[in-house]
Amino acid sequence: MKQVLLFLLSFCVAISSFAQNDKTIKRKVAIGRFSNETQYGKGIFYDKENDPLGKQALDILSAKLAQSGKFILLERNDLELLAAETGENMKKIGADYLILGSVTEFGRKNEGQQKVFSNSKVQTVEAGVSIRIVDAYTGLIIYSDEAKGMAGTTTKEVVGIGGQAGFDATLSDKAISAAISQLVENIINKCTDKPWKSYILSVEDGSYIISG
């Protein structure tokens, strides 16, 4: 009986140890604004603070990093505030890294082909994205990279059957997502290749409050 109890106890300890080792230590990352460095969408009433292309890229990157399960994400939409928060002030929010990005290229292309009994239309979107990873404590850029992505669709009309296809708005998301997907693995590697650390946020009545 004692041997059985000893075996069960050892088994429970092993399972507990395995569960603890299986936990992932997450890095705290602040994502800054993605700027739109292209001419796309910059008309008379263009609002730099609410650029839809930059917001698309930011949302896609945030989603992909969240899906990795390796980060606690802190979204910081004000680039000037991000720059001011390096060093001692950055400890207050406890971020390890800042990720800043830009949409550097964006273009749409429509191509059509007419045949005797059919017409076809090819819609293509190409996008370029660049990112920078900044050490939140030192303010130094530790990594930068860029990538391009493309998405397309083809519609056909046979002898008057089928409507004229308008522009597929989802292609913008798909092209930007394709570009960002090429960068995500390197972002994860660069942000996790250093030992995990935490910050003391405040001391109150002899108790320490630290970032998790």
Question: For each predicted feature, which ranges?
Answer:
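Short, structured interface segments
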Residues: A169-P195
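Short, solvent-exposed, polar/charged sequence segments at loop or secondary-structure edges
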Residues: E49-L53, D59-I60, A66-V122
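Residue-level preference for long, well-ordered alpha-helices that form the structural scaffold
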Residues: N50-G54, Q123, D168, S172, ...
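Bacterial N-terminal signal peptides
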Residues: L6-A14
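Amphipathic beta-strand/beta-sheet edge segments enriched in Tyr/Trp
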Residues: D96-E157
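Positively charged n-region of N-terminal signal peptides that target proteins for export
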Residues: M1-V4
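A structural "domain/chain start" motif
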Residues: A19-A83, A147-M150, V159-A165, T192-K197, ...
